[in-house]
Swiss-Prot record:
GO terms for molecular function: protein-glutamine glutaminase activity. The keyword Methyltransferase does not apply. This is Probable chemoreceptor glutamine deamidase CheD. It is an enzyme of class 3 (hydrolase). Its EC number is 3.5.1.44. HAMAP family: CheD. Keywords: Chemotaxis, Hydrolase.
């Protein structure tokens, strides 16, 4: 069968799993980033004109949103992602963001998911980066897939029987806009409102 468009075939797709503390960026149409989130946040950023995008995945060390020492971990994750996009040819004023995660997964983590979500929204607002979609909070884990070239995102909520990576705050600093499709795991149906937050 001959393809009538320039979309990559399944055999050409490269899926990179983005773990907590990671930051990745690409301009390849064959690249897909995937991650699973509980209390963590992932930020998907894209310059749709330059055709470059990237993802980070972070968890603040505590729920204290006034603790500057802790907030710098989230700021560092954001700055790494923005700088990676700029190196690939993005223009800062064109960068768009979509943010996901921040669920209340366990009592042991307390309100850290809520704090992560609040940090991400405040950071984007303060830096003048347009947030075109978000799905934050709730008590279910999320599986995210992101196409950095176009900014397309898919989200699927996971059930209690799914294995979610154990999330632990990381204290070590590293040196150095398409559509959103939402799926519910149990009926695999596309959710009608891509901006609606879970209850």
């Amino acid at each position: 069968m001959t393809r009538c468009d320039d979309r990559p075939s399944a055999s050409q797709i490269s899926i990179t799993h983005v773990t907590q503390g990671s930051c990745v960026a690409s301009s390849s149409p064959n690249e897909v980033y995937a991650t699973i989130l509980g209390s963590c946040i992932c930020t998907c950023m894209c310059d749709p004109v330059a055709g470059v995008g990237g993802m980070n995945h972070f968890l603040l060390p505590s729920a204290d949103v006034e603790d500057a020492q802790h907030l710098r971990y989230g700021s560092h994750a954001m700055e790494l992602l923005i700088n990676a996009l700029l190196k690939l040819g993005a223009a800062r004023q064109r960068i768009e963001a979509k943010i996901f995660g921040g669920a209340m997964m366990t009592p042991q983590l307390g309100a850290i998911g809520q704090a992560n979500a609040a940090f991400a929204r405040r950071y984007l607002r303060d830096e003048g980066i347009r947030c075109t979609a978000h799905s934050l909070g709730g008590n279910r884990a999320r599986r995210i897939r992101f196409w950095p070239k176009t900014g397309r995102v898919q989200q699927m909520f996971l059930g209690s029987e799914d294995v979610v990576p154990n999330e632990q705050p990381q204290f070590r600093l590293q040196g150095g806009a398409g559509d959103v499709t939402f799926f519910d795991r149990h009926n695999n149906a596309e959710m009608p409102d891509p901006i609606k937050e879970p209850r």
